[in-house]
Each structure stands twice: as structure tokens, then as C-alpha cells.
């Protein structure tokens, strides 16, 4: 499901990741600092999933972030 997120006073990156399900794509308006924060949260989540054994190797990811898939947006993609 592709969902466009509006950034307001209630926006929290962690909350977005908590409510994502397999196959979801969230589009957040692009801002360089916000994009870096989203990338960091995705790498943290992927690292933690590797440590508990859900993801098997370094190349295996659950969350992916793209700035080029949807121009003007940071796309957060939940793969698994």
C-alpha cells in the first residue's frame, strides 16, 4: 500500500516504522536532514533484526529507503 505522509507536529519517524507491514511504501516529503534520519532508523532496525536472527546475512534487509524512486519524496519500503 502506497501512503503519502504529511509532516506536521505529530510526525515521528519511529512511529512510521512501527506501523509498517509487509509491502507498505510510505512517501515522506524530501528534506536532506529528515532523509538521513530515516536512513539511520532503517539501518538500526535492519541491524537489530540481524542480531535477533530474523534476517540472515548482511545483504538481507527488511527496510529500504529511496530518494530516487518517487522524486520529491523519501520512500520507506518494507520488504518483509
Where are these regions (language model features)?
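A generic signature of intrinsically disordered, low-complexity regions enriched in glycine/proline
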Residues: 12-14, 28, 50-52, 61-64
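Hydrophobic beta-strand residues in large extracellular and virion-surface proteins
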Residues: 26-28, 38, 42, 63, ...
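An N-terminal amphipathic alpha-helical segment
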Residues: 1-35
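C-terminal edge-of-domain segments
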Residues: 57-80
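Intrinsically disordered, low-complexity peptide-like regions
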Residues: 22, 44, 55-58
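A short, charged, amphipathic alpha-helix used as a generic interaction element across diverse proteins
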Residues: 33-53
